[in-house]
């Protein structure tokens, strides 16, 4: 029970933090809970697709090759998870009347990502220990939130394109809302999967740089928040 609570705490804390960064017009809490729940549920199709793709990859490449590491982490995990998280946010919030400011998109996508991260964290911690919970609280959960920040920026541009009647731009930016966080996610997971001293140095430098960037980017987007327009 203690580990379960500890596993949920970082995701909930980050949802509260991103909620407070919305300085112009707070999002309905009911909507955010819905998005969070959809993010939790998105773990189910993600797990199924990951198992299927992993089996497909193993038909063509050996598990101990660099090719497999790249395919599995970028396509078999990152692409699938970011797609599922984006869909969770879209199904819950895209048509909601509260989605009327640009920063709203970041709040929604981060909330969806943290719903996903919360249940994933619980599953990992149930099979782990206190050290697992702390490590994931400091690394994995914030990484999901950062993916949500990246996703949210492009998600917001896609929403504005729809309001302008630009279907091509909308479609392009919805794809980017999955592809761009996939890159960060894929690099993160691949670095953890490779066994080399320099990789671990790269990983921790990467985490620090991305964390600092994401914090500054959220503050900037919050400060420049504006109403969505056609």
Predicted regions and their residues:
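Hydrophobic alpha-helical segments at protein termini of multi-pass membrane proteins
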Residues: 1-230
